[in-house]
């Protein structure tokens, strides 16, 4: 029976380490969300409203990305404009 228990314990450790890895990924993802400023969604909406005054675009055609470096933050907007 001790050999059988040995293999069962390994599966539990493997499962635990897998769960730990998944939790670390979730925590890292949540931390990255917190790093974006609170005003970013409102700013994105206002920029979209201004662009819509001149060009008809969908929300899916806009990609907003915020990159934080040590010295500065860069807000990047990629908008696919119709022809």
Curated annotation (Swiss-Prot):
It holds the Pfam family MinE. Keywords: Cell cycle, Cell division. This is Cell division topological specificity factor. It comes from the Bacteria. InterPro entries: MinE, MinE_sf. GO terms for biological process: cell division; regulation of division septum assembly. Belongs to the MinE family. Prevents the cell division inhibition by proteins MinC and MinD at internal division sites while permitting inhibition at polar sites. This ensures cell division at the proper site by restricting the formation of a division septum at the midpoint of the long axis of the cell.
């Amino acid at each position: 029976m001790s050999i059988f228990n040995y293999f069962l314990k390994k599966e539990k450790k493997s499962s635990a380490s897998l769960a730990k890895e998944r939790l670390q990924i979730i925590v890292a993802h949540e931390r990255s969300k917190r790093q974006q400023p609170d005003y970013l969604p409102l700013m994105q909406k206002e920029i979209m409203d201004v662009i819509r005054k001149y060009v008809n675009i969908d929300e899916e055609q806009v990609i907003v990305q915020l990159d934080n470096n040590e010295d500065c933050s860069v807000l990047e907007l990629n908008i696919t404009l119709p022809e």
